[in-house]
């Protein structure tokens, strides 16, 4: 490169610096490079570790170690000083050297929280950034902050754990647990090192994802390229992604854009507690329609994990499907697919339903969420809903019911009917909402008998004695059993029942899922335009329908043998809960450790109920963790367990 050419390049770089300087001043921000020494004044440092020579992504070099050179550079590392200065002459010389033979001398810098601050070699970095180089070699010293429980420090400590395995700084994330998930997605064990080939493959894919993400405006979002790459690896194999063309990669990211936006939120799920109101057509829209007309005929598909003959759960949803046929006769056509197995035929069955013309697809098991998400990405005009809770995927919607409302009422019935102060409770999985169900039942029982105690037994634990045998031996005669009949078990052994002398079971009451009402509400919302109005919205959060008794999708069936006074109490409670006049959790709640969880002056918010992970002091028993469960129960916990997000990556669910 000729000197005159290098002088011209300096002038261009200086203009970039001056532009950045003006923009930062306009927005009240510092126009200079951040200084690590200033940053560390308010940081407790654990230690400093020499890392030796490291290939540093140039975009992660963000500042200087000391304040000595800050006035020479704008915050984008472009030069600010006059061309005729000694600084300008050295920059020009480095520019010529870079173009002619490359800058070979490593810089000296400090790394703090994944960002690099230059001690020696600022001008080299400036030249390399100007020419948009990908990386720079540096002799690095790592500054380790003292551990605390902030998400940023937790994530950084996680990175430090995995850095010896992955040996790259380029992959950055915003969510704790991401490095472990990446390790799993790469097919590696928790402590298995990457090969050079592994690193080359993932960094090549990273570069293509970065280009696609940036083209879609991702550089303006909080979610990193690493976040998006990990999202893709949740849905597609490494082989599928590496074979995809740049255009195909961009199409995949574009199709997942709602899910990318959901990554922006610390809480990616918004809960809808009641059906959307019908859309009101404005006068202008009547004269000149602005939005597409609502459909007049719908095809609705149901994908079930099992059959009605082998699963009462599937039978209940099928009963709801037939309600659609009768309520929307001539407007809605429904069809069902059975025995959908994740990883085998689930994706194919959903694709078959869509090929058959399905406008709406309901998948009725949490295990089908991965297949649902992949189909939603491939068919963005098809409305796909999965029966589950707290799934952070905005491309689909999820749905379940507020069972705790019904459990509160059956708890009051149990408290009134129990001959002693002890009542049995059988729970299946420690999933989202289940501790709330148990506590609501206990609070209902305590409302009519302040001495009531709930004996909790789980069906998901290994080598457990039959709960009914335990209750009978302890003299417990009223039990809240499973919420639906189970093949091979007595028909009466669900809901809340009384154990009579001789072991005869008498129904008292049971929670009832009116799935037909839910499906009817969803179809109505599509036909009248309400579906669009209750979309996740501009914040990009996933929608979880969590409807209760006020929507008609949840109820309590009372036995005809229930004493009339107790039935009268149950109806009063049902009316109060449905009208919103009675809140099961609007009372003083103390947990098993004596901690007051609610003073009683107000109820609990939705997040507190969904994520409840404690038992109130009226309950005798514990909430099992993942490692306590049977092998058969663990897949459900991976999907819906209350501490699902705390599982190590190797134990997380595979979509």
Tell what function each PLM region has.
Residues 377-400:
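Flexible loop/hinge segments that line or gate small-molecule binding clefts
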Residues 529-655:
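Segments of small-molecule ligand-sensing domains
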Residues 399-421, 512-533:
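Hydrophobic alpha-helical segments within soluble ligand-binding/sensing domains
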Residues 321, 409-449, 539-559:
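An alpha-beta-alpha
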Residues 301-320, 324, 337-343, 431-435:
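Extracytoplasmic "Venus flytrap"
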Residues 357-366, 385-387, 475-485, 505-513, ...:
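Periplasmic-binding protein-like
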Residues 343-359, 463-475:
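Short, well-structured alpha-helical segments in soluble
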Residues 1-119, 123, 129-130, 175-188, ...:
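Short, charged/polar connector segments at secondary-structure boundaries
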């Amino acid at each position: 490169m000729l000197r005159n050419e290098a002088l011209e390049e300096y002038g261009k770089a200086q203009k970039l610096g001056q532009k950045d300087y003006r923009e930062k001043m306009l927005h009240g921000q510092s126009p200079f490079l951040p200084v690590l020494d200033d940053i560390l004044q308010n940081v407790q440092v654990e230690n400093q570790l020499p890392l030796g020579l490291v290939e540093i992504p140039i975009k992660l070099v963000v500042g200087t170690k000391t304040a000595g050179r800050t006035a020479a550079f704008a915050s984008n590392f472009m030069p600010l000083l006059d061309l005729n200065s000694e600084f300008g002459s050295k920059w020009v010389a480095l520019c010529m050297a870079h173009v002619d033979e490359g800058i070979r001398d490593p810089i000296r810098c400090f790394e703090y929280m994944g960002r690099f601050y230059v001690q020696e070699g600022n001008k080299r970095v400036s030249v390399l950034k100007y020419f948009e180089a990908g990386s720079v070699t540096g002799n690095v010293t790592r500054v380790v902050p003292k551990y605390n429980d902030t998400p940023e420090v937790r994530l950084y400590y996680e990175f430090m754990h995995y850095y010896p395995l992955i040996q790259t700084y380029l992959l950055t994330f915003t969510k704790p647990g991401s490095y472990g998930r990446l390790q799993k997605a790469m097919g590696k064990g928790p402590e298995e090192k990457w090969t050079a080939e592994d690193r080359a493959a993932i960094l090549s894919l990273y570069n293509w994802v970065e280009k696609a993400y940036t083209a879609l405006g991702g550089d303006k979002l909080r979610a990193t390229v690493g976040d998006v790459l990990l999202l893709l690896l949740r849905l597609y194999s490494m082989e599928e992604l590496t074979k995809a063309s740049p255009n195909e990669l961009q199409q995949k990211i574009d199709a997942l854009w709602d899910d990318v936006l959901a990554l922006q939120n610390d809480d990616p799920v918004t809960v809808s507690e009641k059906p959307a109101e019908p859309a009101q057509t404005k006068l202008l829209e009547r004269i000149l329609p602005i939005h597409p007309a609502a459909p007049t005929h719908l095809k609705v598909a149901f994908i079930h994990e099992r059959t009605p003959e082998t699963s009462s759960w599937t039978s209940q949803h099928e009963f709801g499907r037939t309600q659609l046929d009768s309520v929307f006769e001539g407007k809605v056509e429904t069809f069902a697919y059975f025995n959908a197995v994740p990883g085998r035929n689930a994706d194919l069955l959903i694709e078959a339903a869509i090929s058959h013309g399905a406008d709406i697809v309901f998948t009725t098991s949490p295990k089908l969420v991965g297949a649902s998400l992949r189909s939603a990405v491939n068919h963005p005009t098809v409305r796909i809903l999965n029966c589950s809770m707290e799934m952070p995927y905005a491309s689909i919607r999820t749905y379940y019911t507020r069972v705790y409302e019904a459990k509160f009422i059956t708890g009051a019935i149990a408290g009134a009917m129990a001959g002693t102060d002890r009542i049995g409770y059988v729970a299946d999985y420690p999933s989202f909402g289940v501790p709330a169900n148990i506590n609501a039942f206990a609070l209902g029982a305590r409302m009519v008998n302040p001495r009531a105690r709930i004996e909790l037994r789980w069906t998901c634990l290994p080598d457990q004695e039959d709960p009914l045998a335990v209750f009978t031996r302890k003299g417990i005669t009223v039990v809240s059993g499973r919420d639906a009949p189970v093949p091979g078990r007595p028909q009466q052994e669900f809901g809340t029942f009384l154990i009579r002398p001789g072991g005869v079971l008498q129904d008292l009451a049971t929670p009832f899922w009116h799935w037909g009402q839910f499906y009817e509400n969803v179809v109505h919302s599509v036909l009248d335009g309400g579906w669009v109005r209750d979309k996740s919205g501009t914040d990009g959060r996933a929608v979880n329908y969590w409807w209760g008794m006020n929507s008609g999708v949840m109820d309590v069936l009372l036995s005809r043998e229930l004493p009339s006074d107790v039935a009268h109490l149950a109806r009063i409670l049902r009316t109060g809960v449905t009208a919103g006049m009675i809140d099961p959790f609007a009372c003083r709640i103390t947990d098993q450790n004596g901690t007051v969880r609610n003073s009683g002056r107000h109820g609990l918010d939705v997040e507190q109920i969904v994520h409840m992970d404690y038992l109130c002091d009226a309950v005798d028993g514990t909430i099992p963790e993942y490692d306590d469960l049977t092998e058969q129960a663990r897949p459900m916990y991976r999907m819906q367990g209350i501490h699902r997000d705390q599982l190590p990556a190797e134990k997380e669910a595979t979509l």
